[in-house]
């Protein structure tokens, strides 16, 4: 099993804005991410051009949601910001925010040693 860690409130700020049905779908996909030996690409994909940033992919009633994350020490999935995707390309602002949050996570981890 993979452990999911929520870094600060970035994920929850996104999650709390969703309807109950969307929250249920997100919970289901997060469960798959924790238990699947190999996470299906339908739910999980590395973002090209990033240093270890992934997106968790959630689709519900024609709407597409993305939640950024990364691995730490092999098994832990750290959840960052999420957003509703409205076009084919991931918005550069959302991607830049995720990279900034990922760097913030690892910077804080280094300081704690």
Language-model segments: what does each one mean?
Residues 80:
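ATP-dependent carboxylate-activation loops
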Residues 1-64, 73-77, 85-113:
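Basic, Lys/Arg-enriched alpha-helical interface segments
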């Amino acid at each position: 099993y993979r452990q999911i860690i929520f870094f600060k409130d970035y994920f929850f700020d996104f999650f709390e804005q969703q309807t109950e049905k969307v929250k249920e779908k997100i919970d289901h996909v997060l469960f798959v991410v924790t238990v699947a030996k190999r996470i299906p690409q339908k739910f999980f994909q590395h973002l090209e051009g990033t240093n270890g940033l992934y997106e968790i992919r959630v689709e519900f009633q024609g709407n597409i949601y993305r939640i950024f994350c990364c691995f730490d020490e092999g098994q832990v999935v750290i959840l960052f910001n999420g957003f509703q995707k409205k076009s084919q390309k991931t918005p550069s602002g959302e991607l830049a925010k995720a990279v900034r949050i990922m760097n913030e996570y690892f910077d804080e981890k280094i300081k704690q040693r």
